[in-house]
C-alpha cells in the first residue's frame, strides 16, 4: 500500500480527513445547536464552516489515498492546520466574539487536535524528504 516510508503521513492525513469530514458534517447538521453552544447568534457561520470542512476532508482523503502520497496537498494540510490553530487562538484571546466559556474550551480542544495532525503530517513529510 504505502511506499517510501509514507505510513505516518498517510495515517495522519486519513485521520485529519476523517476528523474534518465528521466535524463538518456535524456542523452542517447541527449548526444551530453548535452556534448556541458557542454563543453565536448567526448559525449560518457554523453551517458554512461545515461545508468547508467537508470539502477539506475530501481533498485530504484524496491526497492520502494517492500512491505515492500527494506531497503538495500534504504540505498545504500542514499550513492549513497551523492557520486553523492560530485563528482559534486569536478567536479565544482577542475577545472579538463573545463566546461562552464552554465554547472557548471547545475551540481550544479542537485546535489541540488539529495541531497534533499538523505535527504528525509535518514529521511524515520530513521522513519522506530525508529518505530521498
Residue ranges and their predicted role:
Residues 2-3, 8, 59-69, 121-122:
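C-terminal ends of transmembrane helices
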Residues 86-106, 124:
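Membrane-helix boundary connector in multi-pass membrane proteins
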Residues 31-41, 94-102:
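Membrane-interface helix termini and inter-helical loops of multi-pass transporters
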Residues 66-72, 99-100, 127-130:
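Membrane-interface helix-boundary motifs at transmembrane edges
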Residues 1-19:
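Cytosolic juxtamembrane helix and N-cap/initiation of the first transmembrane helix
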Residues 101-121:
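Alpha-helical membrane-associated segments of multi-pass integral membrane proteins
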Residues 95, 114-132:
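Membrane-water interface at the C-terminal end of transmembrane alpha helices
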Residues 18-28, 43-65, 76-89, 112-116:
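Core segments of alpha-helical transmembrane spans in multipass integral membrane proteins
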Amino acid at each position: 500500500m504505502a511506499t517510501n516510508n509514507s505510513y505516518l503521513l498517510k495515517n495522519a492525513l486519513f485521520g485529519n480527513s476523517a476528523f474534518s469530514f465528521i466535524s463538518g458534517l456535524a456542523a452542517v447538521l447541527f449548526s444551530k445547536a453548535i452556534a448556541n453552544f458557542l454563543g453565536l447568534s448567526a448559525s449560518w457561520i457554523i453551517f458554512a464552516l461545515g461545508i468547508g470542512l467537508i470539502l477539506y476532508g475530501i481533498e485530504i482523503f484524496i491526497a492520502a489515498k494517492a500512491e505515492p502520497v500527494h506531497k503538495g496537498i500534504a504540505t498545504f494540510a500542514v499550513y492549513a492546520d497551523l492557520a486553523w490553530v492560530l485563528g482559534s487562538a486569536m478567536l479565544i484571546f482577542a475577545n472579538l466574539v463573545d463566546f461562552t466559556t464552554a465554547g472557548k474550551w471547545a475551540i481550544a480542544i479542537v485546535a489541540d487536535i488539529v495541531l497534533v495532525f499538523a505535527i504528525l503530517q509535518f514529521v511524515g513529510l520530513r521522513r519522506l524528504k530525508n529518505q530521498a
